[in-house]
């Protein structure tokens, strides 16, 4: 590194100071999934980013997905998957496999990514400490012949009913980074497979996170011309959903962000996880690569 490069690096560090002050001591919930999880260099960068957040006094909480890994294991076991509205129909035998993959494999891989970067991360599932108390999620569909709404049984697919954050506060208080597999427990003790976006949003609201960062495989929320919308109010987001300018798979992500903000998070950001160090760019620069959603 020559003198000019060193000066540039020092200037970058100095420019981050106001942002470091802003988030010092705050809790940030990061939903980790998509391309950022499957590509080696991005995964490596993610581990270092989370470690850096902890080092500068921020309390990160990571909630991870694992859809491709689950599909791969089910294929190996010759168990067929069926999806309804993007949700995997989950019977009893399948939920055991899903829990094994999420809690026993993916969770440990993500935890080790962060540990190798120098921080102390601990992997848990939503069942640990009663963190995610869930109820069975159902969907309805109108029968085209009878016009009757029929309930569709998704099996052991869950919706967070209550978040008990005490286990998270205990880990954060001990200087540890919680890494959470999105598996919940019902009143009956049954295990429920929970969408990782939904789990992250519920947790962000419960801990009153300063930011919910949702890593995705798109730049953020786009307008009618395909241009990135840098900031959305809750009212504007709901209007765009109603008029169809926010559509498809982006709707549940935006709705998760809105629910997190309604429940106590200060703001949520839909980020392009394909951009290296996207979490750092969002928190510590004025040019965050995503869409900020707030009340």
Curated annotation (Swiss-Prot):
Q: Which positions does UniProt annotate for substrate binding?
A: 66-67, 88, 193
Q: Does the keyword Transferase apply?
A: yes
The domain of life for this entry's organism is Bacteria
Q: Name one GO cellular component term.
A: cytoplasm
Which molecular function term from Gene Ontology is one that the record holds?
ATP binding
Q: In which pathway does it act?
A: Amino-acid biosynthesis; L-arginine biosynthesis; N(2)-acetyl-L-ornithine from L-glutamate: step 2/4
UniProt keywords (A-Z) are: Amino-acid biosynthesis, Arginine biosynthesis, ATP-binding, Cytoplasm, Kinase, Nucleotide-binding, Transferase
**E.C. designation(s):** 2.7.2.8
List the residue(s) that the UniProt entry marks as the site Transition state stabilizer.
31, 253
Query: Which InterPro entries does the record cross-reference, listed alphabetically?
Result: AceGlu_kinase-like_sf (IPR036393), AcgluKinase_fam (IPR004662), ArgB (IPR037528), Asp/Glu/Uridylate_kinase (IPR001048), Glu/AcGlu_kinase (IPR001057), NAGK-C (IPR041727)
The identity of this protein, by name, is: Acetylglutamate kinase
